[in-house]
Curated annotation (Swiss-Prot):
Main location: cytoplasm
NCBIfam families, alphabetized: PRK13670.1
GO cellular component entries: cytoplasm
Keywords noted in UniProt: ATP-binding, Cytoplasm, Ligase, Nucleotide-binding, RNA-binding, tRNA processing, tRNA-binding
GO molecular function terms attached to this record: ATP binding; ligase activity, forming carbon-nitrogen bonds; tRNA binding
Official protein name in the record: tRNA(Met) cytidine acetate ligase
Amino acid sequence: MKITGIIVEYNPFHNGHKYHIKKTRSLTNCEGIIAVISGNFVQRGAPSIVDKWNKTKMALLNGVDLVLELPALYSLSSAEFFAYGAVSLLENLGVVKNLCFGSECEDIKLLTLMGKILYEEPEELKLTLKERLHQGMSYASARGNALKEFLCHRYSLKNNSITEMLHLPNNILAIEYCKSLARLKSTINPVSIKRIGNSYNSTYINNRFSSATSIRNFLKENNSLQELEKALPYNILCILKDLSHSNYRFTFEDSLLPYLKYKNLFYGKNIKYLPDVSEGLENRIESALKNASSYDQIINYAKTKRYAYSRISRILCQFFLGFENLDTKVLRKNRCPYARVLGFNNKGMEILKKIKQNSSIPVYTKLPKNANDMLKLDLMATKGYSLLNKNIAFNQDYISSPLIIDKI
């Protein structure tokens, strides 16, 4: 059975995601699709607008066969560790032939080359990176700058095209996926799909291909879901309407504010133990939490040229969930140690049987009695999310079985 993996967040699911699934099937000629999905917190450093069980339902109703949860440790990390966690999970299953992802650049050879260079870290690249960091650049900017100079010098590529390419978010993730495949010495074949529609950060609602950002902003500020009719698959619109009519609370970053401020009163000194905090950044964040009156104010006060909005927002989510209580810096350097099943259809059940025969890691359809440290963070993520979204029970992980949808 030819199986393709995809790495997704669905925050929320929209037409671009449906297009991705459809193109994945046609390009890879696969018989089944496994989606590794961020759970209740997503990589931009925010609670998911809807919970992971509803996201699983959205995925299964739109062409995915098996949904696995990306542990919170990886989903609340930089692109590098987000990609490594997800790719290592797919690799460990022992059944995945292709990894299909969207990017602004369709040149898979160039993306693979960039990933390989970043994994191998030639001396010339390391020296330039060190220089750019000394100049005060953020790590992501410094590394992108070093990679651009290396490619232009070693491979005679055009400066402007590389600069533009390295500033686009889906390209950045695509390169990290390729880097992770190189690091794992994986035989999984990377496949790139050209991203269409509005840019990732666009706030404009386009009739057909709107960004997740624009849809989230709309849901935050408007009550009329019908205006999203052309931006979402019909079944997704129905799910969101049903949730809205049942007084389901769509979840946004602002809801974190009182909990963060309260925790900061007693445990602010622990911020320095979070995995993405360095060079005194904890002092800026602790001060921001004391003085800010809104979530955006916290980030705008704490961020600098070197520490971007997304990094600060991830740190805030890590603090909210208690990442400082575990050795997360070590944990996230390791391969994903388990696969937790969130849902599947009939084809997904066949894939699951195949995985159980080939996987090098345990596959959980129900929670084990003794959770390892990484799984403990997943459980804490749901408990924390239940404070923000009152429709989710504190012990939801324990009372929810994988969602099973018959594919007709």
